[in-house]
Amino acid sequence: FSATNDAFDSNCNLVINGGKVFASGYGMPEGGLDCADESGYRLFINGGEVVAIGGRHSTPEKQSRQPSVQWRLDKLEDGKTYGIDGVSSYKSVRAYQMGGATLLFSSPKLKEGKSYTLSIDGEKKEQIESLKSPTENVGNMRMGFPF
């Protein structure tokens, strides 16, 4: 958890092979998971339960062994529960506004190519397909603030 920076900032290749990872970073340009991809480093998610929230994240590589889903939200409200079809959920511990927030879930329960629905406090919002590298398919939730 970081109140002012990236939550998990490796500055080198970042490989997650298992366990439970919860990374809550600051808003733009900071994020939950940062491997310094702008410098050529890469993020691989091969296993485990991963929830990352922040302004932006490094995007998992296509060579990752486990799929992820990722949404770009105009805002994220404090105290709300964000979940995907009973696979994983996250209860927000702070609000993200104006710069928006990116929410990433990865779990061995996700199946590549299957569509999942983001819900907020149990209300279904938007469906998106899971991919090993979700850059190509990021859901956009317009919730009050323009990008």
Regions found by a protein language model. Give the residues of each.
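A composition-driven surface/loop motif
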Residues: F1-F147
